[in-house]
């Protein structure tokens, strides 16, 4: 909770004590008692603990030369409320813009992912079939990459997607004997991936 809202809250408590409880002299202890006993105030504070010194500073602001300036206090409270409202609305707008930007970014990343995978799948050598055919206990694969996850999850970046696909192809190449049919297929897929990445870079420029 920011200082303006804390100040507003204590001003409201002071007003309540003064006009509803008919208390001419308001002490810091009176304000502290309300803060500790009032469920609404407790919810507004939301776990924020204000010590006596903090409350005293705000109560002193409320009191002008030992007397309560009713009109001035009302104007100050209205000004603080207006400023807090503007700040809150700006925070909401900023959050909406961030969410909108993130959604657009996710859509672009998913589009890039789908385009790259579709171009690889449209070739006669299909990466996922080759990868699924590898032995589970292959000693050259430390952390097996599951291509279904690549297809269904939004990558954090284009670079991450390219890295995952590159690792998948490298796993295929490293797990097969040089010159074997699967080795040659994996090498061809490597060329296809490089061509696809170049194609996508040109498309995005």
UniProtKB/Swiss-Prot annotation:
InterPro entries: EAF5. It is found in: Nucleus. It comes from Candida glabrata (strain ATCC 2001 / BCRC 20586 / JCM 3761 / NBRC 0622 / NRRL Y-65 / CBS 138) (Yeast). Component of the NuA4 histone acetyltransferase complex. It comes from the Eukaryota. Component of the NuA4 histone acetyltransferase complex which is involved in transcriptional activation of selected genes principally by acetylation of nucleosomal histone H4 and H2A. The NuA4 complex is also involved in DNA repair. Keywords: Chromatin regulator, DNA damage, DNA repair, Nucleus, Transcription, Transcription regulation. This is Chromatin modification-related protein EAF5. Belongs to the EAF5 family. One of its GO terms (cellular component) is nucleosome disassembly/reassembly complex. GO terms for biological process: DNA repair; DNA replication-dependent chromatin assembly; nucleosome disassembly; positive regulation of transcription elongation by RNA polymerase II.
């Amino acid at each position: 909770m920011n200082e303006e809202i804390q100040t507003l809250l204590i001003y409201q408590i002071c007003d309540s004590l003064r006009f509803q409880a008919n208390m001419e002299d308001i002490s810091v202890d009176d304000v502290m008692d309300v803060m500790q006993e009032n469920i609404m105030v407790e919810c507004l504070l939301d776990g924020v603990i204000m010590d006596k010194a903090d409350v005293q500073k705000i109560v002193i602001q409320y009191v002008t030369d030992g007397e309560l300036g009713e009109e001035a206090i009302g104007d100050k409270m209205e000004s603080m409320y207006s400023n807090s409202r503007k700040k809150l609305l700006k925070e909401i707008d900023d959050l909406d813009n961030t969410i909108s930007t993130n959604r657009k970014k996710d859509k672009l990343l998913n589009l890039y992912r789908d385009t790259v995978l579709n171009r690889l799948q449209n070739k006669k050598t299909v990466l996922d079939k080759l990868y699924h055919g590898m032995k589970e206990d292959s000693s050259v694969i430390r952390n097996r990459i599951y291509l279904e996850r690549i297809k269904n999850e939004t990558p954090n970046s284009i670079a991450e997607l390219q890295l995952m696909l590159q690792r998948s192809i490298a796993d295929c190449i490293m797990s097969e004997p040089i010159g074997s049919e699967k080795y040659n297929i994996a090498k061809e897929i490597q060329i296809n991936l490089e061509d696809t990445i170049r194609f996508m870079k040109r498309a995005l420029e």
